[in-house]
Each structure stands twice: as C-alpha cells, then as structure tokens.
C-alpha cells in the first residue's frame, strides 16, 4: 500500500535534498509544503531547488501564485490534498517537503477550518488600521500566547484571522487545530530533521550570504519592477524579501538587510522547533548524519 512520506524540520536543515533522494529511491513525486515557494519568481530567497537540482522529479505546489496574490492555508490544503491523492492513484509515492508549520498540519491532518464572519473580521481589520500590526499582535499575545508564538508579529492577515477565530469559537486558536496525536492523514510517515543551534546557525549565515552573492537583491528588484511585489503583500513580508524591500526603500543598508535576514531566520527556526517538537508522531533524524540512509531504515526500505 502506498502512503505519503513527509519531511519536516527547520529552515536550512536539508529537507529539500532529502526529499529528492527519497523520491529518486521510492519512485516518488514532491509536494511542496513551504508557503513562500508557492510564489513564482521567489527562487533565491526561498532556497527553491533549481530545475537541475530537482533531477527530473516532478514537483507540485511550486510556482503556483503570483507575488501579488495572498497565500491561503485553506486553499493550499484543498489543492495539495488533491495532488497527493492523484499521485497515489498513479502508483507513485508523495513526498511532502517543507517547514511551513500550518501548511504541514493542514496537509497531514484533516483540519476542518473554522468559519469566517465578515462582520467580526471587519471589526478586527478596523482595529488593525487603528493601532497597527505590532500592537494588534500584542493583543493576540495577551489573549492567546500560543497563537502569538507561531504567527509573525508583522503578519497582519494571520493575526486578524487568529483573533477572528478566537472570538467566533470562544476558545484559543489552537483549539481549532486537530490534535497532534491523531493518526496522520493517509497513514503518512512524518520524518523530522533534528538540528542543534551550533550546527544550524552557521548554515543559516552561509546560506544567507550566498543568497545575496547569487543575485537575491536583483531578484527582488525584478519582482518589484516586473511583477508588482510590494512590502505590504504576503510575499513581501517573507523573511529576506521584507529586509531587501526595506533596503530598496532606503530604510536599511544592504549589510543591515543581510544581518536582519539572518536574525529573522534564526527567530523563525526557534518557532519551527517548538512547533514540531510538540508533534510526537515525528520520527526524528539527525540532520548532520546520513539522513537518506536513516530515513530508509525508518521506512523499512
């Protein structure tokens, strides 16, 4: 029986490379679970594999949005579930690869999203316009510290959505999410790459510097000029892209943009670790070892 394999873990831990190796060995196809790799043209700053690095492995949910569009977990879930089931119908193994926490959970769990209420949302959006995203995020933290811990304090859309759900349900945002001890959808095996700060932090620094050496600034300039990328968009708030946009606006030097990208990535990694460590279904693999051999051993292949 074919069942999916998920490869999760923090940024820069080697998920994409392991995903390719598993797909090559298990006749698989990759389903992207990185919310920023959904965007066309956001390549260098998201460490998206090049066509050559994909080694002929089909990739799904990659380059499906323009940078002016808003990524939606609910829409992603609907489309990615269809991709996974279509892959299995052809006798192939879906390899789910990424570290976007809510997107991972939407795919491996049968998450029924809470309803929306236009009046409630409008009230919170008015509050956002009145006090700004930073103070609104502080209000979320006061109401639901766990929700605030997984939502960036510069993400107005998700902050508003969390407050809307809390008001509509009368419960913490987490209560609307499926439990992490339930059997994963399709019997998915979830593999996690375990990292230490001493090992991962230098990789984050190296990767960030290489991004800029390989033309990250020019990538962002092109997205602004040719595709309408703006700082207020979902894509424009991505780590790295937000900092470069600030540099292009004269609010940061390029060196400051590099350093803030590094610190922003480290902060995001801490949230990823906290999130994934709470999921006891994950089979952990040390990222600094032979991850392919260990993964195949866990899978009994």
Curated annotation (Swiss-Prot):
Catalytic activity, as annotated: adenosine(37) in tRNA + dimethylallyl diphosphate = N(6)-dimethylallyladenosine(37) in tRNA + diphosphate
Keywords of the record: ATP-binding, Magnesium, Nucleotide-binding, Transferase, tRNA processing
Record: residues binding ATP: 9-16
Residues covered by region (Interaction with substrate tRNA): 34-37
Binding site for substrate: 11-16
Cofactor: Mg(2+)
GO biological process per UniProt: tRNA modification
EC number(s) per entry: 2.5.1.75
Source taxon at top rank: Bacteria
Site entry: Interaction with substrate tRNA: 100, 121
GO molecular function, one term: ATP binding
Gene3D superfamilies documented for this protein: 1.10.20.140, P-loop containing nucleotide triphosphate hydrolases (3.40.50.300)
Assembly mode: Monomer.
UniProt function note: Catalyzes the transfer of a dimethylallyl group onto the adenine at position 37 in tRNAs that read codons beginning with uridine, leading to the formation of N6-(dimethylallyl)adenosine (i(6)A).
Sequence similarity: Belongs to the IPP transferase family.
Name recorded for this polypeptide: tRNA dimethylallyltransferase
Gene field: miaA
């Amino acid at each position: 029986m074919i069942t999916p394999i998920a490869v999760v873990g923090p940024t820069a831990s080697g998920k994409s490379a392991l995903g390719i190796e598993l797909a090559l060995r298990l006749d698989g196809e990759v389903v992207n679970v990185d919310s920023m790799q959904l965007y066309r043209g956001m390549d260098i700053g998201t460490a998206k594999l090049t066509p050559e690095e994909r080694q002929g492995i089909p990739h799904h949910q990659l380059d499906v949005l323009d940078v002016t569009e808003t990524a939606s977990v609910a829409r992603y879930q609907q489309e990615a579930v269809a991709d996974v089931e279509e892959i299995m119908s052809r006798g192939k193994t879906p390899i789910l690869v990424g570290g976007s926490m809510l997107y991972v959970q939407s795919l491996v769990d049968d998450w029924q999203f809470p309803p929306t209420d236009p009046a409630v949302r409008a009230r919170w959006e008015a509050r956002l316009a009145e006090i700004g995203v930073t103070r609104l995020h502080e209000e979320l933290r006061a109401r639901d510290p766990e929700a605030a811990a997984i939502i960036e304090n510069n993400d107005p859309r998700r902050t508003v959505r969390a407050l809307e759900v809390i008001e509509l349900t009368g419960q913490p945002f987490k209560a609307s999410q499926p439990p992490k001890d339930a059997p994963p959808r399709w019997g998915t095996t979830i593999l996690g790459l375990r990292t230490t700060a001493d090992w991962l932090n230098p990789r984050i620094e190296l990767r960030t510097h290489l991004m800029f050496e390989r033309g990250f600034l020019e990538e962002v300039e092109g997205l602004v000029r040719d595709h309408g990328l703006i700082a207020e968009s979902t894509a424009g708030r991505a780590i790295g892209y937000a900092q470069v946009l600030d540099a292009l606006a004269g609010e940061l030097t390029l060196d400051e943009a590099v350093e803030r990208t590094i610190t922003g990535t480290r902060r995001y990694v801490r949230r990823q670790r906290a999130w994934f460590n709470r999921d006891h279904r994950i089979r952990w693999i040390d990222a600094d070892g032979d991850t392919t051999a260990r993964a195949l051993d866990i899978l009994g292949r």
